[in-house]
C-alpha cells in the first residue's frame, strides 16, 4: 500500500511539473523570437511575465538585466541610463538570490558596472574599475573555461591598456583564447547564455590589424 501511495505521489508531482516546464519553455522561446526580430520591448515584457510566473528560474531576470545593459551602451541621457541600469541591477540582484556564485551572473554584473564607466570614465572609472576586474577574476575562478568571462575580462583589460598606452599583446592572446573556448562551449540548455563569439572574433581581428 505504501509503495502504491509513493507511486501516486510521484506521478502527481511529475504531472504538475511537466506543464509548468512546458509553459516556461514556450514563454522563453517566444521572448527570444521577439528579441531576434528586433522587438526588444516585447521581449523584455515577456521575460518579466515569465520571471513572475517562475520565481525559481534565474534566466528571465538575467535577460531583463542584459537587455537593459545592452540598451545602455550608447545612451547619452543620464536619466534614461540610470533608469535602465537601475532596472538591470534590480533584476540581476533577483537572479543572484536564485542562483548564487553563478559565473554568468557575475559577468553580467561586471557588464552593468562597465556601462557606467563607458558613460562617464572620469566619474565611474575610479569607482568601479577595480571591482570590475575582481568580478571577472571571480567568474573565471568559478568556471575557468567560461568563454564570456574570458572574453569580457580580456576586452576590459585591453581597452584599459589602450587608454593608458600599454602593450595590448597579452590581452589579444586572451581574446584569441576566448574564440577557441566559444568553439567548444556547450550551453546547459537552449535558453542559457551563449552570446559573445561575434564580439570575440571582431576584437581578435582588430588585434591583427
Say what each PLM segment does.
Residues 21-69, 76:
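Start-of-domain marker
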Residues 34-46, 81-91, 125-133, 172-179:
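Helix-turn-helix repeat elements of alpha-solenoid scaffolds
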Residues 70-79, 110, 115-124, 159-165, ...:
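Short coil/turn linking the two alpha-helices of tandem helical-hairpin repeats
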Residues 169-173, 177-209:
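Terminal, low-structured helical/coil segments at or just beyond the last alpha-helical repeat
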Amino acid at each position: 500500500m505504501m509503495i502504491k501511495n509513493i507511486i501516486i505521489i510521484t506521478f502527481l508531482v511529475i504531472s504538475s511539473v511537466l506543464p509548468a516546464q512546458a509553459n516556461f519553455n514556450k514563454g522563453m522561446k517566444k521572448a527570444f523570437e521577439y528579441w531576434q526580430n528586433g522587438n526588444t520591448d516585447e521581449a523584455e515584457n515577456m521575460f518579466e511575465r515569465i520571471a513572475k510566473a517562475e520565481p525559481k528560474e534565474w534566466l528571465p531576470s538575467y535577460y531583463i538585466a542584459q537587455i537593459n545593459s545592452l540598451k545602455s551602451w550608447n545612451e547619452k541621457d543620464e536619466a534614461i541610463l540610470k533608469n535602465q541600469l537601475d532596472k538591470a541591477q534590480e533584476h540581476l540582484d533577483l537572479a543572484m538570490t536564485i542562483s548564487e556564485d553563478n559565473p554568468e551572473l557575475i559577468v553580467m554584473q561586471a557588464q552593468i558596472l562597465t556601462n557606467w564607466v563607458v558613460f562617464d570614465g572620469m566619474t565611474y572609472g575610479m569607482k568601479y574599475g577595480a571591482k570590475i576586474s575582481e568580478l571577472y577574476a571571480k567568474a573565471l575562478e568559478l568556471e575557468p573555461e567560461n568563454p564570456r568571462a574570458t572574453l569580457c575580462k580580456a576586452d576590459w583589460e585591453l581597452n584599459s591598456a589602450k587608454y593608458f598606452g600599454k602593450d595590448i599583446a597579452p590581452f589579444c592572446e586572451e581574446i584569441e583564447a576566448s574564440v577557441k573556448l566559444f568553439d567548444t562551449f556547450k550551453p546547459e540548455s537552449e535558453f542559457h547564455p551563449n552570446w559573445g563569439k561575434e564580439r570575440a572574433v571582431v576584437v581578435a581581428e582588430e588585434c591583427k590589424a
